[in-house]
């Protein structure tokens, strides 16, 4: 555990049962945690950072993550957290049950415009699993790989630990791959 992570966890413990909040900044000397005061009117359910604290963090270094906690809550970002994360365009680190969960900023899962290798089918389920706490590696995808006897989705998902199940055994959280206009999913 890094010194930054230790400082984040200590701040969350001190603030509980209220949500803690702060920033991770990067400076030439390294990464640091800047704790902030939660100015929310309901600090046990929400967090709010004063604009002055945000400016203070920006003046001390490059903000690389926004941090807050869910004391007694769940280890993933709420719907409101996700909306605010997208507006901030920052990774968010969430303290929950003594652990730090790191969420990169991903666009909303619905309403995306398809762009091969950027917001394609693999990116969609990679982002969905990331939001649920499971990391999947990204991989390079050449255009038209499906026309060159490659099956990148199935091959790369197997490396990540996914495996094929009969449709009759499918359950929530499984991925369904379909072929539309191609011979491979």
Where are the language model's segments positioned?
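Short gly/pro-enriched beta-turn/loop segments at secondary-structure junctions
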Residues: 16-18, 109, 119-123, 171
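Short acidic alpha-helical/loop segments enriched in Asp/Glu that coordinate divalent cations
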Residues: 134-146
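Active-site nucleophilic cysteine motif
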Residues: 115-132
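Glycine-rich catalytic cores of cysteine/serine-nucleophile enzymes that process amide/ester linkages
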Residues: 107-119, 177-185
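Short helix-to-loop capping/linker segments positioned immediately adjacent to catalytic or ligand/cofactor-binding
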Residues: 10-14, 109-116, 164
